[in-house]
């Protein structure tokens, strides 16, 4: 009995091994055939695919590849006979008509090809189950109109089928944005769950230019749908569109409409406000935060909105800023819920009011009440900034180092590392600054990574070689003085590079690597002092020396803004906005330049 059981076990085991070996052989053959096919070795691929198809005649992948191999080797008759034989054995496999049609298409027999395509489409009325396969084949053969017809036929005969997504993608391939957007919108209309998917695909066509053809068509499609079939989702999409176009006030209007219908959630408005603030659209941002303050019952949400209102007051130099902060502390107190407001207030005291000691006291009090290590880190970051402002570098570096130790790999630790690099740069310790910046170039936070790369390149491009002065030490010191709001001293430091012969034998002249950076910093300081014409002179000198500088689009935008907002020279403003539009189409200033140029030209909004 034991021997019989052992024999059965060995037999079954042998069969299993043989089966696994056979499957492995098939997989290896399929991989080899596919490799030959992709490399264009169609004769070799044909032999293997034929063997695979003969052993698995129901495998449509093998069939498709075999037919394609026959076509690529001009064996059209063999392909035709194979397909007709397959159809003869099963007339329900209507996708075979597409193969047959394309077989004639490859032979330039257009009319014959169309006959088979029509048969395939008509056959779907009786066999809609093959609709997806037929449409997919049409798409693969770039027969996009036929693919759309196939999907629509299936949907007409099967009310549960929904191929609007596939249809929309095909319209996109055809460049028919109107139909594409209509199909995507229909998909959302049928089921809101498609929202994120559709938004992701639509974003491939939407730009930040409100005059972009796709943007206009998408907006019109949404407005038509909103009128014929009102749904909250259309407002959400319009809000998203306006946000992409930096039309934040219009986005707010859509969110207000949603809020009026369903009061409660203000997170979208808070997000729009923050984006507008970061993008320097302060009026629109203020509208968002004012609305939250007026409508929200959530204390934390209200405090957050007030924080940004205070930040806007600081950046726009509102004379009532001090009063605004004091009122906030009267209403909400100085506690853990207002820590960010306390940090913002300390920043205001230091960099706007030149009261760093008072700011230091505010932050020391905040630090004593903070319980979260993240809150403590934020406070220490600002304390470090204030200590640098006061020239107490070593104490500042201690705070920054503490954050790095306590919050390893966190965004705040990366920010602290950048502060270490920046402080080291200010001190003239360029090697240590570069060591920190090398680590940060791969930062997960894009803004920190960008700042790190910019500072690293500034040091690398301008640092002294073989102890020969390069002016970098003087530039770093001028930047420190500017950070400390000692603008006149900073300008004096920079002017010495042009006048004195200590660093450059002939003074700083075009051709020196540091020339652009020095003039650019001078221009920014002169703008701050409202010496706009002098700033224009400095910026123009950079362009004269090198109009291909990486600063060129920054310079053009700065000049356009000065002419537009401060010197009231609309003609010159248009000239420089236009330079960005036509000479720097990938510039971060493109959207604003285009909008402002159109406004100055008198275009209707």
Named regions from a protein language model:
Residues 18-605:
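Acidic, polar-rich low-complexity tracts and alpha-helical solenoid repeat scaffolds
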Residues 4-13, 467:
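Sec-dependent N-terminal signal peptides
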Residues 1-4, 19:
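Positively charged n-region of N-terminal signal peptides that target proteins for export
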